[in-house]
C-alpha cells in the first residue's frame, strides 16, 4: 500500500503538500487529492467531472498533463463544459444534448465540422 500511495502522490503532484491538512490546501491541490483517492486502487476506468473547474492556468496545465498521462494506462471518462479541455486531453469526444448523443468522434473530426469548437457545439446543440 505504501508503494501505491507514493506512486499516486507523485502522479498527482501532491509531494509538496503531503504533510498539510486538506482544509489548508488550495482548490487545485484539493482537486488533485480527489484524483489521488480515485487512483489509489488502480481502477481500469477513471471518471472525472469538471476536473479543472475553478483552477488557475498553472493548475489547469498540471491537471491536464496528469489526465493525459493517466489516459495512457486506463480509460479516462471526462465530463466537462470547457471545450478547450476536450481539445487538450480527449482522443474521443461525445456530445450529449437533451439526453441524446449528437456527436461521437475524434477531436479532429469535430474540428473539421466548423471553424471553432464553440461553433461546432452551437451547431450540434441548436438544431
PLM ranges: what are they?
Residues 100-122:
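Conserved beta-strand-loop-alpha-helix hinge in the C-terminal portion
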Residues 1-97, 102-103:
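ABC transporter nucleotide-binding domains
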